[in-house]
UniProtKB/Swiss-Prot annotation:
GO molecular function, one term: transmembrane transporter activity
Cellular localization per UniProt: Cell membrane
Residue ranges, Extracellular side: 35-56, 107-112, 164-176, 250-264, 315-320, 376
The protein's name in its UniProt record: Alpha-ketoglutarate permease
PANTHER family: INTEGRAL MEMBRANE EFFLUX PROTEIN-RELATED, MAJOR FACILITATOR SUPERFAMILY ASSOCIATED DOMAIN-CONTAINING PROTEIN
Family: Belongs to the major facilitator superfamily. Sugar transporter (TC 2.A.1.1) family. CsbX subfamily.
Domain of life of the organism encoding this protein: Bacteria
Keyword terms: Cell membrane, Membrane, Transmembrane, Transmembrane helix, Transport
Length: 435
């Protein structure tokens, strides 16, 4: 028993709520299954008969499904609880994948491809983002920044690192179709760990005599009832514009200065490796220096500066691989400066944390549309330099907006006391930690 308590103490000290550790492990395994198709599914479908436009439309439909699912995940958790919401996400992924792989791809029937892949797209936000909402409810405020940092570490590690790494070996060994089927093993294993091994009890703040439809509508109305939450959603949308926009035009721009596709891919991959490490670091920094200050200076200002540096460095010094690698890594680190936003937003709406997290998750989805849209609209008339300045200006604007995301001391004290009481009732681990 002492060994178990010791492990719980260690996990809490590094920022992982010990009573939710199996949920974190479940998320990373689930996201491996979701991310294993990155980089090769579109070329595979084109090789089997789709046009490039049809493939682009397929992924656009998928993105729409992801955005809607992400937006609603928080209010679903607040209304029905995280286990039910995550179970719906797991089933959507499994059913959508089965239809997509087992029937739509063999027949290459385009409407079926659109519908089944969109159903699959509903899955991971309902699963992963609902767990993030769960974390925001069940974690003490003094480690909440680190706790959400660990969530984004697990999420990104599975989606952008382990998933593609696994498929780089699985596709040559088993083929594309069997690799897609293997995703179900990962999501099932992750689902079992997060839903059944994770013993935390969820206790949402209940509203008396409020119909469920009104609770669900909070995902939209909270942005007007609490403008700070709406501002936070805008900041979150700006967060990843570089992540979704750079890949469209930077490789072509860098090629003018002698950077090969291979060098670009190495720089891009290393950027995200640094990012997942700094997700944890800036989670801890946010708990020490303040969530708002971390997002504003390290996230907004940092991303703005290194966005400009990525563009101007090749012009100033030409082909210098390691210099550009260092700058890209600095951008990846600054990108993680936005991590405390996941702790800040639910604290701005202590009575509607689920709705606040829905707005945060909506921002996560919207940037996947807005960034390519900016590139497509302005790359022609303004060129790469114009797009870079638009991105940098948006990052600096997000830093300005973050100034308004203030929390009153009174709300913070009430929230901390509520968290303290709930955790002592819920888990033996936290009871030990608090003693």
């Amino acid at each position: 028993m002492n060994t178990v308590h010791a492990k719980g103490n260690v996990l809490n000290k590094i920022g992982i709520p010990s009573h939710m550790v199996w949920g974190y492990i479940g998320v990373v395994i689930f996201m491996v299954g979701d991310g294993l198709e990155q980089g090769w599914l579109s070329p595979f479908l084109v090789d089997h008969g789709l046009s490039m436009q049809q493939s682009a439309s397929l992924f656009t439909m998928y993105g729409i499904a992801v955005t809607i699912s992400a937006w609603l995940s928080g209010t679903f958790v607040q209304t029905w609880g995280p286990r039910k919401t995550m179970t719906v996400g797991l089933l959507a992924f499994i059913l959508g994948s089965a239809a997509f792989i087992g029937w739509a791809i063999p027949h290459m029937y385009y409407p079926a491809l659109l519908g089944s892949y969109a159903l699959r797209g509903l899955g991971y936000p309902l699963f992963a983002y609902s767990f993030l909402v769960w974390v925001s409810y069940s974690t003490s405020q003094n480690i909440l920044g680190k706790a959400v940092g660990w969530f984004w570490f697990m999420f990104t590690c599975g989606l952008n690192v382990l998933g593609p790494f696994y498929s780089s070996y699985a596709v040559p060994a088993f083929g594309e179709i069997n690799t897609l089927w293997s995703a179900l093993l990962f999501v099932a294993a992750g689902g079992i760990l997060a839903l059944f091994f994770n013993k935390d009890k969820f206790t949402p703040i209940q509203k008396q005599d409020q119909p469920k439809w009104k609770e669900l509508s909070k995902a939209f109305t909270i942005m007007f009832e609490n403008p700070k939450v709406g501002i936070g959603g805008v900041v979150k949308t700006i967060n990843a514009i570089g992540q979704f926009g750079f890949a469209i035009f930077l490789p072509t721009y860098l090629a003018r200065y002698g950077y090969s596709v291979s060098e670009w891919l190495q720089i891009w991959g290393t950027l995200f490796f640094v990012n997942i490490v700094f997700n944890i670091i800036f989670g801890a920094v946010g708990d020490k220096l303040g969530w708002r200050n971390t997002v504003m200076w390290f996230g907004g200002v940092g991303c703005g500066i290194f966005t400009l540096a990525l563009y101007y460095t090749p012009q100033l010094i030409g082909h210098q691989y390691w210099v550009l690698m260092i700058i890209a890594c600095c951008y990846g680190a600054a990108l993680a400066g936005y991590v405390p936003l996941s702790a800040l937003l639910p604290t701005l709406a202590p009575d509607n944390k689920g709705a606040a997290m829905s707005v945060l998750n909506l921002g996560s989805g919207l940037c996947a549309f807005i960034a390519p849209g900016i590139v497509s609209l302005f790359i022609g008339p303004l060129g790469a330099g114009g797009v870079i300045w638009i991105f940098a200006a948006l990052y600096f604007f997000s830093a300005f907006l973050t100034r308004f995301l203030t929390i009153s001391e009174q709300s913070t004290d009430v929230y901390t006391e509520e968290r303290f009481v709930r955790e002592n009732v819920q888990t033996n681990f936290d009871k030990t930690v608090k003693q």
